[in-house]
A protein has these predicted regions:
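Conserved catalytic core of nucleotide polymerization and phosphodiester-bond processing enzymes
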Residues: 1-601
Length: 601
């Protein structure tokens, strides 16, 4: 019932009681069960417990019958049956299989990361500006503390409170002599707390500190110190080696280390169960876009190997098995090319060109082969220029797909450490140039906007609907948000569902014995991580999976088939999630489990 309701209306809540209240109002007395819910299970009486269970079952069935009719009437039943329900079974299997954790290596990281964090803090404390501020800041705290003690002395009666007066006078003398003994006194001379909502804003925004401009405030009205603010402030600093730039770079690095430790090292240590596995939750109904989401852990946000290989290295294949990771490449762009009919992207994808480099070459009126030659030659004087051009073409394309505005695109296009700062106005100009180069994409967007304004929702290739009442809002910001999703939703949703449906087909073919046995342990919107015995990894099995993923047979189930571009899929093999060795046809993967195996060999 919950999944049916999600397909009918992707907005929350999706829990049973909320759905009964909304769709079965004649059973309003069900709300009285809220009090019963608060009683611990071992304290509930049997008779009301049986009645409660029967009500749950009855209302679940009534809701399902109600939703089923709605799904049929709205033409969503095929999507529900062939995608949502089958995906639910597959994801239940993924959750049960779990991600195997190398506990010994996890413990190594627990021991080694804290010194890294402390070293990063120490580097910030040793910055001249921070040292100077800390001295002034602590002196100010000391003076306030002494003033408080002196005020207390004045309010004491010398005839009655002689010992109290002497005690406070001694404290003042000790502090002025640089002797701090109590916990409260030691707080007066500690380093600035880089995680404090009091200390850090003072360091960043006061005249005694770095005196940054306040560009954002938090909910309590105080200057913000969140990651987005730090990143945007960094874009305002032109010189990469200036004190402000060094401070912001160092603080962002510290935040990254702390997040890695708390989420992926300490967090996984606490969540790993007795079977040495992380059994996360994979949710079909967790996003409004239709993309898969996950929690405990959030598989979508596991850092890439290039960021820190040690994080994925904790996730190993169980003894006697290997990872097969099947990873979609540029799926959203391929869907965008199909939906819009954009020849530049279609030609690049179908000819095997690098699409981002092809777009950059078109923009700068350089033949693709010449641009590719420069891009691949690290010794060419223009190599770095073309690296930046390709990266910016990629950021613009994905920025449009992800529905970001010119401010966030400016952040994406900038590289402060390399001295590249892009303003929102410049980012907007780049977006306009991009649309000028891709008129069919602009035409597709106008069609989407027209449909959205008429109907109040968008529809994906797989039949999902995204309801956007914001399109009718008098608030221009809300209307702009809905318009950005006119490209974002159909591309993101269909790309995720292509991966999901391909994974469903592989799961059922494997269960029917038509593919070698594998266990999917992690499924995200653009990748499927499976474990299997090495003898199951061969040219035939990989080719069969590749054929399914590149163009799953969608016509019989959803009424469409993409015929002008195929999906691109990379297969990598490894003993852990961090080891990403490209599949080699004909290789005997049993060798990877031999004690003397090395990647270099």
């Amino acid at each position: 019932g919950m999944l049916a309701k999600y397909l009918l209306n992707e907005e929350k809540p999706n829990d049973l009681k909320s759905m009964v209240r909304r769709y079965l109002p004649e059973y309003g007395d069900y709300e009285k069960q809220d009090k019963f819910d608060k009683i611990p299970w071992d304290k509930k009486e049997l008779d009301p417990l049986c009645h409660y269970g029967c009500q749950d079952t009855d209302y679940t069935l009534r809701l399902m019958l109600f939703f089923e009719k709605k799904l049929i009437d709205l033409g969503l039943y095929n999507t529900y049956r062939n995608l949502i329900m089958t995906a639910s079974r597959v994801l239940t299997s993924v959750e049960k299989n779990g991600l195997y954790v190398d506990r010994a290596f996890n413990q190594e990281l627990l021991d080694s990361y804290l010194p890294k964090i402390e070293a990063a803090k120490e580097a910030i404390y040793n910055l001249p500006k921070v040292k100077k501020f800390t001295k002034l800041y602590n002196q100010s705290k000391i003076e306030k503390y002494i003033a408080k003690l002196e005020e207390e002395i004045e309010n004491l009666d010398p005839r009655v409170d002689k010992r109290k007066i002497q005690s406070r006078e001694q404290k003042i003398a000790n502090i002025r002599a640089g002797v701090f003994t109590t916990k409260k006194e030691l707080e007066l001379i500690r380093p600035v707390s880089l995680g404090s909502s009091v200390d850090l804003p003072q360091l960043m925004y006061s005249e005694e500190g770095f005196n940054f401009e306040v560009i954002k405030k938090n909910d309590s009205g105080k200057p913000s110190t969140d990651e987005e603010t730090l990143t945007n402030l960094r874009l305002t600093v032109k010189k990469p080696d200036s004190p402000k730039a060094v401070f912001l770079d160092s603080l962002l690095e510290l935040r990254g280390l702390e997040k890695m430790y708390k989420t992926y090292i300490e967090g996984w240590h606490e969540k790993t169960q007795d079977d040495d596995r992380l059994h996360g939750r994979f949710l079909i109904h967790g996003t409004t876009s239709g993309r898969l989401s996950s929690a405990e852990p959030n598989a979508q946000q596991i850092p890439k190997t290039s960021v820190d290989p040690n994080i994925k290295k904790q996730l190993v294949a169980p003894k006697g098995t290997l990872y097969i990771a099947s990873d979609f490449s540029q799926a959203e762009l391929r869907i965008m090319a199909h939906l819009s009919g954009d020849e530049t992207y279609l030609n690049a994808f179908n000819s095997g060109q690098d699409p981002h480099l092809a777009i950059a070459a078109t923009k700068y009126h350089v033949p693709y082969e010449e641009a590719l030659k420069i891009y691949e030659d690290e010794n060419h004087p223009d190599h770095k220029i073309w690296k930046v051009r390709r990266k910016q073409a990629k950021q613009i394309a994905f920025g449009l797909i992800y529905g970001i505005g010119n401010k966030l695109l400016a952040v994406k296009l900038s590289d402060p450490k390399a001295g590249i700062i892009v303003t929102p106005e410049e980012a907007q100009k780049e977006m306009d140039i991009f649309f000028g180069q891709h008129p069919k994409l602009k035409t597709f967007l106008k069609k989407q906007e027209k449909f959205l304004r008429k109907n109040g929702y968008l529809v994906s290739l797989f039949g999902r609907k995204r309801r956007l009442p914001q399109i009718y809002s008098s608030d221009r910001g809300e209307e702009a948000y809905a318009l950005r999703l006119a490209l974002n939703f159909p591309c993101q949703s269909a790309a995720s569902d292509m991966c999901l449906f391909g994974s469903i087909l592989i799961y059922y073919l494997m269960r029917q014995g038509k593919l070698p046995p594998t266990k999917s342990v992690c499924l995200v919107h653009d990748a499927n991580y499976q474990i299997t015995k090495p003898e199951n990894i061969n040219t035939w099995s990989i080719y069969e999976m590749w054929q399914i993923y590149r163009n799953p047979l969608t016509k019989p189930y959803f009424g469409f088939q993409i015929d002008d571009v195929t999906m691109a899929m990379d297969f990598v093999i490894g003993r852990s999630m961090a080891e990403e060795l490209p599949f080699i046809p004909g290789y005997d993967y049993r060798k990877m489990l031999e004690p003397d195996f090395s990647v270099e060999g």
